Amino acid sequence: EGTWNRKLFTCPYHSWSYDTGGALVRAPVMEGAEGFDPAACNLPEIRSEVWEGFILANLDAGTAPFAPQVETYTRYFENFRLADLIVARTLEFEHGWNWKVLVENFMEAYHHIGVHPETFEPAFHARDSRVPESDGPWSILHMPSAHPDEPSILPPPPGLEDWQARDLFASVAFPHFLLGIQGASVLWYQLFPKGPDGLSLKIHICLPFWLKEAEDFDEIVEGTAQFATAIHMEDIAANDSVWAGLTAPMTGQGRLSPLEKSIWQMNQWWLDQMT
């Protein structure tokens, strides 16, 4: 737990120590233990890869690599230079609903009309949102700016086109790797499901490393944190109601709107995993 920079990992129980490669380098009071071979006690290797600066770990050694599955997705966002991001601040929440409630809420703008009438809806009209076709385990929600002539709040990364700098994007690599992207700022929603009816959430505010040199960097981070919190508080109230409805005895399946195409895409992916 926590964040560290160490050359050895030491178990707090019996003080066995391992190097960063997972090799056992110290095992106190093991002299005389018959058949004890330190080389046979190395830590197991967890499969991992680095994608656009994110370290992805997978306990299933048989799963296909991540990057080839999201090549089109990666090209869609290549101008945003995701690998240049740093985590400027992290917001933490606990929620009493299934993680899929959050993902579905994140990936459609239809609810802007009712949930965000004074925040998102005036800036990104629900009716203008669109979801491109997907060729892999991912989905992208593109929300064009309702005010395309207004300048960007933050200086955009070099090479970003005007529409990329002003429009808002939500994306998911299934099942729940969520990124909210606008210009130079990215919100990474990191989900930790705790069961069918709860999750922990960390919202990481990510900004380009070069923006850290700005004199008003702290104000930028604070302003982003306040806005992200305000939006999420609006979503919390909505998701609480959604969960109450989903767990009610008379709940049935409704019809998706064309604006909820991303949810449909996730459902198709889910069906593929189940067959």
Indicate where each model-derived feature is located.
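C-terminal catalytic domain of Rieske-type non-heme iron oxygenases
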Residues: 49, 54-275
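Rieske [2Fe-2S] iron-sulfur-binding domain
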Residues: 1-61, 67-72
